[in-house]
Amino acid sequence: HSINEEEELMLLKWLYRNIKKNIFIESRTDEDIEKYSDVIELNLSSINPCVSGPKRPQDKINLEDVKKTYLNSLNSEETEILVKSNSNTLSNGKICLAAVTSCTNTSNPSVLIMAGIIAKKAVELGIKIPSWVKTSFAPGSKVVQEYMQRAGLQKFLDKLGFNIVGFGCTTCIGNSGPLDESISKKIEKENLNVCSVISGNRNFEGRIHPLIKSNFLASPPLVIIYALAGRIDIDLLNDEIATINGKKFFMRDLWPSSTEVKAIMDKVLKAELYKKNYKEIFEGDSSWSKINITNSSTFQWSINSTYIKRPPFLEDEKNNEKKIIRA
């Protein structure tokens, strides 16, 4: 029920007393303060944006050190190829896969909205993703799709090439699909050390794609930024990510403020959005509902299927029953 002024005043008094007692330590005695086995002091100004890579998820790299770390990972031959390469052609250090994936984004709308705002600003400025970058967006649920559409941001992600390809595991587990044939051939022919940047949680060599040696884990907004740059050997804090008609654009030109992000979150994130989508979670779309199935408690094997066959060894055992001895 809606509360009246008297009830509201009582609630505010209760909140004030409890907040004062439990949060503001200076107003409490030593006996009131909780004792912990370990106390960690953290200087918030020491926190830096970072990514992980190029081979393991635990290998954290500060954003300002990504370029240096990648260059140090190259052997002498790869370094020579990179030095001789043209910045506008496929070579070592170029990003061939950029994906906003489901595993680390569904419960964090703020970073997805940030990614959408970056895409919007890039489209409005005329910044495009280089041709060698394959892009995709795989939300963890349809809730994400709906609030990105409500925010008017999905259309800008689409224009950059970050179209929704599915819901759930995709590029992060190696389900990216093939690279463009011409790109694959050049990577193999020249033995290039190309990269992927995904917002997943695993980046072991060969896991994302067999032709991609260096893989980096980053937040969704950084995935968009790196895709626009098209290469990993860049200092995003200082180097331009694109030049249009002689004008240089930097990450700071695209990065949204917390105020921008909060304004959109307050507008589109509503409880009913989640209730509606999870209520319909087992219904599926029209393609799912059109599938003809037999009403049975066990799987109905099809003799015409070339994909799933009934294991023959189960039938063999059924026809050759043996007694169990000394079990």
Feature locations, PLM:
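Fe-S-dependent hydro-lyases/dehydratases of central metabolism
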Residues: 1-327
